[in-house]
């Protein structure tokens, strides 16, 4: 496995590669990331993973300085999974000058995560486009856990006419169904035991809708009340149409319920896809 930190040697290494699958990460890898690597291996011959903590997608009050940086450990995990190349640039490599040209996503970036993390998706879209231009993969794999991000990356590829297939990887969960996240390591022991409640309330919403309940506002409100009762500071629980992420309507078919809430100092997100029974 090659670990490359600069753009020019990466491009030299990629000469002649015509079947590339790319998995961008910020490091702090766990089984969720590794499942994306395995998906990438099923699609293309050469698998590239990037490790880069992107300052542009962090607000000044967020955890950029605290975010896990475990490059040596991450590279060992990636090598075990059969990754061919790790691209691990320094910040000055991707941003040699202040990034004045930014990718401004569609209005969907201003709702849900975008509402509570202003500028987040602008930073994500900008770095993803830069990485796509550097790596030039035929396939890129993103996880469904970051559901809104996946939607925006798909729109990015479509609207910029990028010849890249965007593959969605399923959310990987711990044995108690907590969605795996690099930020889970921030949780204290008692918080880790409580953290599964986010999945539980989303599951309850899913069951209600699949059982015929169409009082979406009531379901969202009840879910947030349950979380608040147990000490969570909830940003949103929201039922959306799956393909557009517009607020769900009673006649919609495929839906998704998304939630984001803070437990202590740790902000967690999760989502569950919903397929109502046909009447």
Swiss-Prot record:
Q: Where do the annotations place beta-alanine binding? A: 57
Keywords attached to this Swiss-Prot or TrEMBL record, sorted alphabetically, are:
ATP-binding, Cytoplasm, Ligase, Nucleotide-binding, Pantothenate biosynthesis
Where does this protein act, in terms of pathway? Answer: Cofactor biosynthesis; (R)-pantothenate biosynthesis; (R)-pantothenate from (R)-pantoate and beta-alanine: step 1/1
Q: Where does ATP bind?
A: 26-33, 143-146, 172, 180-183
Q: Which GO terms describe its biological process?
A: pantothenate biosynthetic process
Keyword Nucleotide-binding attached: yes
Domain of life, per lineage: Bacteria
Its UniProt miscellaneous note says:
The reaction proceeds by a bi uni uni bi ping pong mechanism.
Designated name of the protein: Pantothenate synthetase
């Amino acid at each position: 496995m090659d670990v490359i930190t600069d753009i020019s040697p990466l491009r030299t290494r990629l000469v002649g590669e015509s079947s590339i699958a790319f998995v961008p990460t910020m490091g702090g890898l766990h089984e969720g990331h590794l499942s994306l690597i395995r998906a990438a291996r099923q699609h293309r011959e050469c698998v590239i993973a990037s490790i880069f903590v992107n300052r542009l997608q962090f607000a000044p009050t967020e955890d950029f300085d605290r975010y896990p940086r475990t490059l040596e450990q991450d590279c060992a995990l990636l090598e075990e999974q059969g990754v061919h190349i790790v691209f691990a640039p320094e910040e000055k490599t991707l941003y040699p000058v202040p990034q004045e040209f930014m990718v401004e996503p569609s209005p969907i970036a201003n709702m849900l995560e975008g509402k509570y993390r202003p500028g987040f998706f602008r930073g994500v879209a900008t770095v993803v486009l830069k990485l796509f231009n550097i790596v030039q993969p035929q396939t890129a794999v993103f996880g469904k856990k970051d559901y809104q991000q996946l939607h925006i990356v798909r729109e990015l590829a479509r609207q910029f006419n990028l010849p890249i297939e965007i593959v969605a990887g399923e959310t990987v969960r711990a044995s108690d169904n907590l969605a795996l996240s690099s930020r889970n390591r921030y949780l204290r022991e008692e918080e880790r035991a409580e953290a599964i409640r986010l999945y539980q309330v989303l599951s309850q919403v899913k069951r209600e809708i699949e059982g015929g309940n169409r009082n979406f506002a009531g379901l969202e409100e009840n879910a947030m009340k349950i979380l608040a009762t147990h000490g969570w500071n909830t940003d949103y629980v929201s039922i959306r149409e799956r393909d557009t992420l517009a607020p769900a309507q009673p006649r919609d078919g495929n839906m998704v319920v998304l939630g984001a809430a803070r437990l202590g100092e740790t902000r967690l997100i999760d989502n569950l896809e919903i397929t109502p029974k046909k009447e």
